Amino acid sequence: MAPKGKVGTKGKKQIYEENKETLSFYLRIILGATVLCGAINLGVFYSSSNFWTWATLVFSGIVYAGAYRSMRSMAQASFSEDGSLLDGGIDLNMEQGMAEHIKDIVLLTAIVQVLSCFSLYFWYFWLLAPGRALYLLWVNVLGPWFTADNSSTVPQEQNEKRQRRQERRQMKRF
């Protein structure tokens, strides 16, 4: 059963603390996946490593760096001169926020990176990221724009007059 009433808001300090925890959690994921992939490729599969193995490692590093830097800049807190917290930054744990999509990219990259230690074909799963971006672009921007009807060309006054006329006609029938 859903809780009744208004959802409680978070304070600046709570957002600041949760953002620090979130950033450290995703940094551990990034470092863990990269170290694991590097150790497996260097230790176990070194003889079968090729250019694409290392290119995907560099690609994932670039994705990680961009995503982590974006999350860190979103969570940037501001303090006053006396050291008190003025702004806790953007809440990284907010649902349907941009940070949620960035966290999904980090998780997808980590999963694909670890799986790619065994087969480079797992990198095709990374195509889910641009696919999801195109889907969101279509649903939120392009789809409504293409399917919007052109009723806005008729002035609002004429629409109201037509509606009143139709109401009068309906009243006469009864």
From Swiss-Prot:
One biological-process term from Gene Ontology? autophagy
Q: Where in the cell is it found?
A: Endoplasmic reticulum membrane
Point out the signal peptide segment. Answer: none
Spans of biased composition, class Basic residues?
162-174
Q: Which Pfam family, an example, fits this chain? A: TMEM208_SND2
- What is this entry's stated membrane topology? Multi-pass membrane protein
Q: Which GO terms describe its cellular component?
A: endoplasmic reticulum membrane; intracellular membrane-bounded organelle; vacuole
Family matches, as InterPro entries: SND2/TMEM208 (IPR008506)
Q: Where is this region: Disordered?
A: 151-174
* Keyword annotations: Autophagy, Endoplasmic reticulum, Membrane, Transmembrane, Transmembrane helix
Residues annotated as transmembrane: 25-45, 51-68, 105-126
Q: What does this protein do?
A: May function as a negative regulator of endoplasmic reticulum-stress induced autophagy.
Q: Which family does it belong to?
A: Belongs to the TMEM208 family.
Q: What is this protein called?
A: Transmembrane protein 208
Q: Which gene encodes it?
A: tmem208
